[in-house]
Amino acid sequence: MPAEPLPATGAAVGIDLGVASLLTTSDGEHVANPRYLAASGATLLAAQRELAGKQRGSNRRRKARERVAAIHAKIRRQRLDHAHKTALAVVRGHDLIVHVALRVANMTRSASGTVDAPGTGVAQKSGLNRSILDAGWGIFLSLLANKAASAGRQLIAVHPANTSRTCPACGQCAAENRPSQAVFRCVACAHTGHADVVAARNILRAGLALQAARAA
């Protein structure tokens, strides 16, 4: 983490968090999401099955439990290291960084819901929850905030509404602008682009508008 303010770069960036890529920038850069939990899935599952088959209170069960814990600890270390390096690169390269305001804990609540409010699309939402947690959005945003503050960078969080549906060329906002998860195609002006890059550009624009409003 930078211990003192970094030299000015004159650059501003919007970042869109995702699961296909950890983040996509308004400059068109895609930062990989290593999916550490998924990558260790087979090893973890085998260790968990071995643990389940050991007799409670036995020495073998204790050792099996330690193996499961060690795998989880390795995944956490890998995820934290990647988040550190990614956040540091973003902070070093930009004076102004804009992201959407996300409540990751709320987004990853149990997909099954409650007795009074049962969940819908449980299997799909559970899969998305795992992907979000594996990507480490919360960890990354926390590190980004700390590093930005330490380096004297400005960090702005904006409302996510319509950032993925609005055309950066003409301003048209429509759900139909997203024919697929990865593609943006404006139904009004035919502007096309990668959907995540479009979202990041809209996030940056919203941040610059908020910055200007605060300065007025």
Walk through the language-model features, giving the residues of each.
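Positively charged, helix-rich recognition surfaces that bind polyanionic ligands
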Residues: 1-216
